């Protein structure tokens, strides 16, 4: 409609409209990851959405796992032989590896990206869940309605940009309500465990200053935190509240049921494909980050607040 109206008004330089399907015919999309995604429940739902959207567009889907930059030349060879036209990247949080993949000069979109304290220039598109505002909003609710006066973050907040934004959302809520930040309330260990090891995690919690609420980097870490608190005989939510993130299927079945923040995984998958299709059909020099709206899911671990 816009192009027709422009033509009627005499704007002869307005670009000719086209059907994206014309430019997508016989194109091949590579789903590139550094881990086996089918082992991660959150990614299974996003993958299904990606597969459905690509099928709707009659685009071929290829998969490749790049576990280390040592095998990058193998990846290049595979891309050339397979005649890949665009790349979707998931679980890519290594800055050097990202640079190598971007150097392929193909249309590329990442789901989430690396955290960096040097403010890197993202010369690629990113699609991710809305982290900061979602966590901030939930924390403000717990402050105003749940009488929470201290917060701690559980998870390696530098693991990826999403985790860092969730950490910032907690900090931002505290700042807005004049709640002092105490780093002793956090469990910010690296990724070498301890979040999958109950003994190590419970030992770290025992040494920490217990806040009114733990904000966890994701639902898996939150469920492990609930178990660690049980080992320490610390009641949830009576003594401490716990928040996760993702709204994984298992979050409904923890004891107590886990309060979390829902991510629309179907929309996330669709937007990843949409962003890549736009890069393939409408090349642009400008890179962008697209956020998918998230919302809180109160359950028992925050006293249904």
Model-predicted segments: where are they?
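Flexible loop/turn connectors
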Residues: 198-305
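N-terminal helix-turn-helix/winged-helix DNA-binding helices
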Residues: 1-39
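Short, solvent-exposed amphipathic alpha-helices that sit
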Residues: 41-56, 134-137, 161-181, 224, ...
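An alpha-beta-alpha
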Residues: 136-178, 288-302
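Short beta-strand elements in bilobed, periplasmic/extracellular small-molecule ligand-binding domains
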Residues: 54-66, 153, 171-197
């Amino acid at each position: 409609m816009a192009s027709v109206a422009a033509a009627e008004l005499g704007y002869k330089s307005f670009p000719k409209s086209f059907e994206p399907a014309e430019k997508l015919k016989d194109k091949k999309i590579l789903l590139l990851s550094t881990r086996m995604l089918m082992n991660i429940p959150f990614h299974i739902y996003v993958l299904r959405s990606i597969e459905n959207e690509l099928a709707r567009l009659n685009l071929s889907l290829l998969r490749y796992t790049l576990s280390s930059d040592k095998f990058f030349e193998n990846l290049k060879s595979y891309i050339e032989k397979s005649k890949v036209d665009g790349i979707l990247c998931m679980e890519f949080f290594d800055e050097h590896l990202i640079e190598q993949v971007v150097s392929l000069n193909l249309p590329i979109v990442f789901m989430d990206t690396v955290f960096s304290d040097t403010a890197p220039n993202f010369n690629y598109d990113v699609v991710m869940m809305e982290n900061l505002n979602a966590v901030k909003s939930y924390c403000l609710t717990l402050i105003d309605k749940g009488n929470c006066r201290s917060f701690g973050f559980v998870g390696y907040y530098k693991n990826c940009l999403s985790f860092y934004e969730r950490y910032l959302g907690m900090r931002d809520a505290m700042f807005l309500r004049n709640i002092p930040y105490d780093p002793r309330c956090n469990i910010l260990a690296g990724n070498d465990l301890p979040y999958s090891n109950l003994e190590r995690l419970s030992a770290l919690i025992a040494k920490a200053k217990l806040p009114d609420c733990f904000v966890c980097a994701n639902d898996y870490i939150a469920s492990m935190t609930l178990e660690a608190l049980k080992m320490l005989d610390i009641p949830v939510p009576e003594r401490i509240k716990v928040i996760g993130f993702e709204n994984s299927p298992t979050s409904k079945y923890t004891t107590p049921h886990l309060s979390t923040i829902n991510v629309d995984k179907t929309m996330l998958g669709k937007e990843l494909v949409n962003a890549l299709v736009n890069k393939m059909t409408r090349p642009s020099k400008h890179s962008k980050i697209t956020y998918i709206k998230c919302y809180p899911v109160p359950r028992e671990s925050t006293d249904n607040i």
